[in-house]
Amino acid sequence: MKKTILKFSAILTATVIAASCIQESIPVGGSATQDQVSASDFALMSMINSMTASMTTSGTGGYAGSYGDHTDFGVPGIHLRFEHMLEDLATMADNPYYNRFYAYDLNQAQGPQYTYCAYFWKMYYTWIRLANDVIASMLPAIEDGADEETMIQLKHNLGQAYAYRAWCYLDLARLYEPKENAEVPIPADIYELTVPIIDENTTIDDCKNNPRVKRDVIYQFILDDLKRAEEYLDGASSSWSTPNHMMVYGLYARTYIELGYERKGYNMEMFEKAAEYAGKVIKESGKTPLTQAQWTDPSNGFNNATSNNAWIWGIGLSAENLNNLLSHTSHISNEAAWGYACYAQVGASQLLYDAIPETDFRKLSWLGPNKEEWSSGKYRFAGTEADKAAFLNGSGRPGAKPYSALKFRPAQGECSDFNVGNAIDYCMMRIEEMYFIEIEAKYHLNPTEGVQLLKDFMTKYRDNSYNRIQSGADFATFKKELLLQKRIEFWGEGILLFDYKRLDEPIDRSASNHAGVFKLRTQRRSPQWNIVITRAEFQSNTAINDSNNNPDPSEKIEIL
């Protein structure tokens, strides 16, 4: 594999060491000053684009250049980190270390002194800083006035920045709030602590003593940002590639379903809100779940927003900002000949695969155990017949194994040229997630209705013979079935970690097709999902230290 590394603009790579406010050309604190960011209309309009580019560019965090880290490609890389901390993404290779996310699978080096946990902190706060820059620049520009067309664009860009910032803080709150688990006790005085808030008004001095805020504070901040986003995005394009009302409503739904689960019980008002906003997206967006043809499309499957009607929000990846190895496709698509995936041989856990009935077309996301079926026409393969033969039989790389993943295709079905195959559209939210949020919320409000909604979704969109859960199912039964369907639906997409953590679900990597070194099991939610704050933050923020950090979970999970 060619290990070509691109050089990128300093505005994308020279960012932050965290929320720490070390003096830089643009402070990591609240935002850039007007001297640092041009007030021209062109500069203002382009600021939001620099943020989206930084979310997906190869080497965007500087970890590739500093440490040779080939998992440094922004949001898609973060989402793959989530997947490797769960149970269903199996590494099946004889040499499992082609899986470059192995530290997350192993639950090793997850403490504050390591880069593995630091990556989350650095990247989300980088994007928050960029959102703050946009907000700090747009607000005075709007106050100064402009012609009608420019004013509309300024407001829409401001709304996008608020939406992006809300998304960042929602992920951070869910990642860093410590939750009870069976392996690593949580000190009583850090329950419900999340992360420091940095907004457009935060100064460098503020950052030097900026504590973790409580759960209620961060979620109110998120809801306030979403309200502002909703206001400023009025009349904005409904394009999948930029925040719009449907994306904002989807973030509301994610936020409220999380708020429905409190440490000492449930909050029914929050479940009502979650159902309301998920329902708004379902009813008002005009979006529809993926069909079987779209799901299994060998050229466009999970890589092309315009090939389906399901995506609410996504990011288009440009070939100019990607290299062969630091990309989503090279780590998740077995059919891509240039990447790590075909050597790591990523697939579904056999335990998950065996739980899927043959009548559910989503089972076609992975090769079955019967090799005679592989060339029978049952499966659709990307590329040419030669590409198919190389993937199945091996040609300069290992041949496919049972349970190998087919879900994520190289762009345009291109299996050989990474410049083409890496330039995918990356999905951040699709309509199916809203159905599942509505189902979960409705169950808490009316169990019979929740079960029926799950049945309706499954029989209409996924498996018309579905009948796995009965009316009157208790919450434990419902939760298990709901999560199973989400595991099948969102495998590899970076959605599920938040479900597992919220629902207090264990992981079980005892399936025979997991690499031996990655086999482990938890009794409840994994302690690894209480992400540890990087020590780099301690060096500049006196309000955070070892005493109020999340406990280090490294090597505290049972190895099988």
Question: For each predicted feature, which ranges?
Answer:
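Conserved, well-structured interaction surfaces
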Residues: 95-176, 213-217, 228-236, 419-426, ...
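Sec-dependent bacterial lipoprotein signal peptides
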Residues: 1-19
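Membrane-proximal, proline-rich intrinsically disordered regions
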Residues: 21-81, 331-347, 352-358, 362-367, ...
